């Protein structure tokens, strides 16, 4: 048996003893040599004791108790500590570039929009200040997207308890529409169609949803066959806003490219399952669909493999000619003397005139063309002006390099080094990039850009007011 923590109180020594198998308070009178059990606790041991002017303080069962040796009373103490808790007060926090997520651009690239700490922020390309359009610590606003006509912004908010789609004016001062999604969960990567009528996005259960922004009606366009930590089933709208393109896992765990017609619900498989195809992007003309494909992906299909090394992957760049009436943009060229004909006036089509996307299903896979660049570790594509495509190459020790291929020049150019994220505006004239802690907006024309071009300097001066206690209510 143990006897510990002796303290003097009056003419007696008080101590903890576990002679009856549970640590209780005992006393010893030196003048008589008598020992006495003072407490008869049966649930928890006494851990520590100390003596004060009014009795013995002891810790037991997670509480402090005061024992009066004269009366034998044991009183549980209620202790309230009013701390400063400055970290729980409302405060202004700096916006860190590394914490800006879900980036998007306004239609013409005049402002960038982000999610930050459950708020939606916009920043100007050059002139002006950053803007918090939500100011809601008590709810989380996520995944903003700007409408192609420029006057609306959509995002997901859990202010009702479940995530809903909120559509506001671009200043965030007026909620135009609130759309409830059936079977609410967590939603990802919204994309607004060019005709302003629909928004496509995915959910936790790997469904592609399409929401009518006018009526609020929603439907599931397709569902991925298997769960995978890399969410590659991200819908991309055709230039006319009538189709979406997306990769989908097949039985062999390779991904194939599909397109879905919103009006009819028709699905067309663009690529077979003999290669792993990702990152579909429509050409601005609507005639071609670019994508990346790998024929050496097989050893990487088991993503839960606990081995230390993954097999290296290479991908090649392809395009599919969608309409059988269109010819390949990469047909052999031959310089010939041009015969001058009588001049006729033709009305030039502007890039804003979105021609209808026509897809001829018959023979489609035979109209897939390999673009003449070496197979490398390409990780994604991004839209570009007509007959051009951005592609990203991951290079060991150099990071991700952004490059651009031009179907007219038939060669790639280095565009921007060391990029982490790339977003293209609706008009395909502006590019938002992140390189480390630098965000910038630059033009999609030309080549040889460098990190720092078009830097969003207003981020460094932006502060957001947060209410930590309201945030905790939302989080927990």
Where does each model-flagged region fall?
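Conserved blade-ending motifs and adjacent loop-strand segments that build the rim/top face
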Residues: 2-3, 36-50, 268-279, 378-379, ...
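Intrinsically disordered, Ser/Thr/Pro/Gly-rich linkers and terminal tails that flank
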Residues: 369, 396-476
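Blade-terminus and WD-like Trp-Asp/Gly-His loop motifs, strongest in beta-propeller folds
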Residues: 5-12, 48-54, 104-110, 144-152, ...
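Predominantly a core beta-strand signature of beta-propeller blades
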Residues: 33-37, 72-76, 129-131, 173-178, ...
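Long hydrophobic segments that form regular secondary structure
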Residues: 5-10, 113, 363-413
């Amino acid at each position: 048996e143990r006897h510990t923590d002796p303290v003097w109180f009056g003419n007696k020594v008080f101590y903890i003893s576990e002679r009856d198998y549970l640590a209780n308070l005992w006393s010893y009178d030196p003048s008589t040599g008598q020992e006495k059990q003072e407490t008869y606790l049966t649930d928890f041991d006494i851990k520590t004791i100390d003596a004060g002017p009014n009795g013995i303080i002891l810790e037991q069962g997670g509480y402090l108790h005061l024992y009066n040796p004269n009366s034998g009373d044991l009183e549980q103490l209620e202790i309230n500590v009013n701390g400063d808790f400055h970290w729980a007060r409302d405060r202004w926090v700096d916006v860190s570039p590394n914490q800006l997520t879900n980036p998007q651009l306004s239609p013409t690239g005049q402002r960038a929009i982000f999610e930050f700490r459950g708020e939606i922020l916009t920043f100007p390309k050059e002139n002006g200040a950053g803007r918090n359009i939500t100011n809601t610590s008590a709810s989380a606003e996520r995944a903003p997207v700007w409408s192609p006509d420029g006057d609306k912004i959509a995002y997901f908010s859990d202010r009702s308890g479940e995530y809903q789609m909120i559509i506001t004016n671009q200043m965030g001062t007026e909620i135009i529409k609130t759309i409830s999604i059936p079977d609410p969960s967590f939603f990802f990567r919204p994309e607004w169609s060019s005709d302003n009528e629909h928004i496509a996005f995915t959910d936790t259960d790997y469904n592609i949803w399409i929401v009518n922004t006018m009526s609020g009606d929603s439907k599931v366009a397709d569902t991925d066959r298997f769960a995978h930590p890399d969410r590659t089933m991200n819908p991309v709208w055709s230039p006319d806003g009538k189709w979406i393109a997306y990769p989908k896992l097949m039985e062999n765990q390779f991904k194939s490219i599909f397109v879905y017609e919103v009006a009819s619900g028709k699905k067309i498989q663009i690529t077979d399952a003999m290669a792993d195809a990702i990152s579909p992007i429509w050409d601005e003309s609507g005639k071609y669909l670019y994508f990346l494909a790998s024929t050496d992906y097989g050893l990487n299909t088991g993503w839960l493999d606990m081995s230390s090394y993954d097999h290296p992957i290479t991908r090649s760049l392809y395009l599919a000619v969608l309409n059988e009436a269109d010819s390949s943009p990469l047909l052999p060229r031959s310089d010939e003397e041009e015969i001058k004909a009588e001049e006729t006036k033709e009305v030039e089509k502007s890039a804003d005139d979105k021609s209808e996307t026509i897809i001829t299903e018959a023979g489609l896979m035979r109209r897939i063309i390999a673009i003449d660049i070496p197979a490398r570790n390409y990780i994604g594509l991004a839209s570009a002006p007509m007959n051009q495509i951005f592609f990203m190459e991951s290079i060991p020790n150099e990071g991700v390099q952004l490059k651009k291929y031009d179907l007219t020049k038939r060669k790639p150019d280095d565009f921007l080094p060391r990029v982490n994220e790339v977003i293209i505006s609706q008009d395909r004239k502006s590019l938002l990039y992140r390189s480390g802690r630098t965000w910038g907006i630059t033009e999609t024309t030309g080549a040889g850009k460098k990190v720092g071009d078009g830097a969003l300097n207003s981020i460094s001066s932006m502060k957001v007011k947060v209410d930590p206690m309201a945030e905790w209510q939302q989080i927990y």
